[in-house]
Amino acid sequence: MTTLRFTLPLPPNRANARWHWREEARLRAQWLTTARFAVSASGIKLLRKPMERATVRATFYLWSKQDQDNLFARLKWPLDALTQKHWGFIKDDSPDVLRFGWMPEQRIDRKNQRLELELTEGWMVWVEGNL
């Protein structure tokens, strides 16, 4: 069973944003470029074939705690980036392919804000003793 761990730059909070579509496209392209460099620098190799089914765990390191809906909104760009269209780690980000094993976690780290994703091949459910 393959497990990949990504440390990505913190994506902007999109939940309450009302960006013009051009501004959002610019920010998204900028974030994708920065995130791609982070993945390359980490030494994670591309897979020969995208995962058909995967479970993701997300841990946010933030300035201050946020509502859960804001965390899910922040996951949009990173999960899109994992797909075959961009980086090719998962076939798609639809519920038939990608599931959450746990609610996104959040921790306070004001000096090093980031998003850590753990992508595991297959569908898993983490339980309290298995963290």
Language-model regions, residue ranges each:
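Catalytic phosphate/metal-binding cores of nucleic-acid and nucleotide-processing enzymes, i.e., regions
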Residues: 1-131
